[in-house]
Amino acid sequence: MDIESLANAVFDEIENEVNLTSKWKSTSKYARIRHLQIDKRGSFGERLLRDIFSKERNIALAYQDGDQGEWDIKINDIKIEVKTSSLDVNDKFQNEHIKNTPNCDFICFIGVAPDNLFMRLEKISEIDFSKLHNRGARGTGAGYKWDFKKEQMIEVKTREEVVALFYAEMGLDKKLIKKNLKSKQ
């Protein structure tokens, strides 16, 4: 018997044990996020928004894979930082490295649960950073940390729900955008 067969049998045994005790089952819809490195989880959130808004007409969308600095995606010149986290053992989404910067307009928090996606969009200028954990103050990291429970976020199931959330929070009027584009023609 080769080592791969033995190793796979052990993986199966452990996976069955984990499936009995964890909310993250091997069969969960979004279990694959747990296999990604932390920075690649961020890429998942950024690319998800890219693909959601690339199907939206009459908007200007800017996204470049990798680190653009203080924002990740731009919609009609509104700069958005994307923070993606998965549900932890305490039933929270932990978001790290949050920056208080004038060079970005919003933060989109994407929470990935085993079988659900959640979002929350916050305008940076309206965040009370004094209520967040400043990781830099104690030398435990950089930026701020902000945790959310599922109840503090909005569950999203469709592309249209995400678009509606963004338009409402960013103050964009889809009909007005279309009207302005038609008047320029």
Where is each model-derived feature located?
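Nucleic-acid endonuclease domains
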Residues: 1-78, 83-185
